């Protein structure tokens, strides 16, 4: 094994690293839900109902997140997995 092969080799992430990354995602998601306004769950449900008027989807195919910055700026992020056309 040469010295160059050592630097080129990609190291596989350990299970501990993967678990840590997943936990960070879960904690960030829960913090976001905790800081969301009271009307957010109802608004999310209404958005899903409007999408269902036009496309047949499951609730788990819709992701709605509210990101809030310190600059009093809120961003509503909506991700919808749409079915393919027949």
Swiss-Prot record:
The domain of life is Bacteria
Give a yes or no for keyword Kinase in this entry. no
Q: Name one GO biological process term.
A: cell division
The UniProt entry, under InterPro entries, shows: MinE, MinE_sf
The disulfide bonds in this chain are none
Keyword Nucleus listed? The answer is: no
Enumerate the Gene3D superfamilies for this protein.
Cell division topological specificity factor MinE (3.30.1070.10)
Q: Which UniProt keywords apply?
A: Cell cycle, Cell division
Give the family per the record.
Answer: Belongs to the MinE family.
Role of this protein:
Prevents the cell division inhibition by proteins MinC and MinD at internal division sites while permitting inhibition at polar sites. This ensures cell division at the proper site by restricting the formation of a division septum at the midpoint of the long axis of the cell.
- Quote the protein name from its UniProt record: Cell division topological specificity factor
Q: What is the species of this protein? A: Shewanella loihica (strain ATCC BAA-1088 / PV-4)
